[in-house]
């Protein structure tokens, strides 16, 4: 694969702890991951970029020359989780089911989970 692997994006180390990649669409496309920002569980995303293009090799976002993640606000994270569930249900092999379940358990309020 000719792009920066999302599991190698660990900056900023003082704030971010990666738990797992939920969805990786590959080169020149997006990835979604689950982790903790300042100890709080969150869903994040980034554009992977391409190592074949020096201008885009680190993807986006980048902070201080290091590839990073964008933390999704709760309302966007919930909609993203629903879409990832649909993709998994339709057989999309790029969805990491185990990490998706960890993410749902950590981010879905109990009242929402009982109404699903």
Predicted regions and their residues:
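Negatively charged, low-complexity tracts enriched in Asp/Glu with abundant Ser/Thr
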Residues: 1-26
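Generic intrinsically disordered, low-complexity segments enriched for polar/acidic and small residues
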Residues: 12-13, 20, 31, 44, ...
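Mixed-charge, Lys/Arg-enriched low-complexity segments
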Residues: 49-116
């Amino acid at each position: 694969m000719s792009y920066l692997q999302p599991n190698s994006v660990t900056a900023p180390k003082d704030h971010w702890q990666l738990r797992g990649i939920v969805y990786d669409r590959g080169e020149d496309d997006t990835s979604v991951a689950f982790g903790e920002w300042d100890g709080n569980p969150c869903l994040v995303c980034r554009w992977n970029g391409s190592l074949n293009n020096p201008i885009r090799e680190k993807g986006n976002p980048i902070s201080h020359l290091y590839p990073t993640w964008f933390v999704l606000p709760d309302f966007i994270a919930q909609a993203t989780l629903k879409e990832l569930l649909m993709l998994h249900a339709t057989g999309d092999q790029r969805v990491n089911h185990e990490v998706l379940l960890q993410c749902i358990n950590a981010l879905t309020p109990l009242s929402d989970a009982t109404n699903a």
